[in-house]
Amino acid sequence: FENKVPEKQKLFQEDNGIPVHLKG
């Protein structure tokens, strides 16, 4: 899972500047 975090994190951060996986 963590291997995909950096890739998904880049896309999620664009939502509100906050990673969606951290927002829940």
From Swiss-Prot:
GO terms for molecular function: oxidoreductase activity. Residues 1-13 have a biased composition (Basic and acidic residues). The keyword Transmembrane helix applies. The modification N6-acetyllysine is found at K10. It is found in: Mitochondrion inner membrane. Keywords: Acetylation, Membrane, Mitochondrion, Mitochondrion inner membrane, Oxidoreductase, Transmembrane, Transmembrane helix. Pathway: Energy metabolism; oxidative phosphorylation. It is a single-pass membrane protein. Component of the cytochrome c oxidase, the last enzyme in the mitochondrial electron transport chain which drives oxidative phosphorylation. The respiratory chain contains 3 multisubunit complexes succinate dehydrogenase (complex II, CII), ubiquinol-cytochrome c oxidoreductase (cytochrome b-c1 complex, complex III, CIII) and cytochrome c oxidase (complex IV, CIV), that cooperate to transfer electrons derived from NADH and succinate to molecular oxygen, creating an electrochemical gradient over the inner membrane that drives transmembrane transport and the ATP synthase. This is Cytochrome c oxidase subunit 7A2, mitochondrial. It comes from Ovis aries. The lineage of its organism: Eukaryota, Metazoa, Chordata, Craniata, Vertebrata.
